[in-house]
């Protein structure tokens, strides 16, 4: 009999930025690394003979909580990947909701009906992961192994093993980041011992330290460039408000890429302007639209645009006392130097580290 710990990856930037990231790669967030540390503590006293992960960074980084402290090698297997999301890959969930809302509901609730061009079906994902888990389990008969995989794929497999038909898997639990399930493979029988345990994500005082953020059906913006005359007026007003409130600088003619963010309304809720590849010129969310995670979604768009244009770092120039400082610091922007005018350049490294 093989004991198999099946683990969802830690929080990745795609989760935070509200973008679809099936086969799309990306870094872990600061919270994600906190989850990895909590997972490492959980497995300190658990014997593990081998560790597997998909070949995507977010699972490899998560698996480092187990294989590194135990001095094991990491085995990468593409069959452990998340669902291929086809044409959805890299799109904001808000954009998917606007353009393909029915299929987005299917993705979360009516999984047997979910279809996306150039992507997998739920049944294909379920079959792929089950075959991979069984194959790996047979290879390590009599041992204990850990496998880091992805939320949708894990949900499809565990739902089947717990007796949910594909039509009902949408009623089954969703996995927290780094949630741990234990399976046993005994001959042909693959059974669930426990599912989706996240007890390691709580501190000794029972305060949650790193729980999962909202699902795909919750807040997510879509974006467009200003093209209408009335939008130019809105742009000027939002840009002026941003300059006054956040201490960002720069005239409109210095900006090379401008996006409005829409939070399910006709009027824009947010503004992102890039001064060039790797430099945010302006980032602003209307006061009445704050506390919904929209600011970090704008950072996500800046990250995507920078990476798509060959950049490896992202920066913004702020006044030292800018109220925007906290948002950027929370999202791993570090002060690197001051300008001659006394402003501070904050920079974020967009590269995935290669040591996991």
Please report, for each region that a protein language model flagged, where it lies by residue.
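Conserved beta-strand-loop-alpha-helix junction that forms the acyl-donor binding cleft
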Residues: 315-325, 342-343
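Conserved acyl-CoA
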Residues: 136, 297-313
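Acetyl-CoA-dependent GNAT
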Residues: 236-281, 286, 299
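Conserved acetyl-CoA-binding loop-helix of GNAT-fold acetyltransferases
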Residues: 34, 285, 291-304, 330
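Active-site-proximal alpha-helix that buttresses catalytic centers in soluble enzyme cores
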Residues: 7-72, 76
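Acidic, low-complexity terminal tails and accessory targeting/binding regions
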Residues: 87-95, 159-229, 348-356
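Phosphate-handling substructures
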Residues: 70-128, 196-197
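Conserved active-site alpha-helix within GNAT-family acetyltransferase domains
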Residues: 157, 296, 320-337
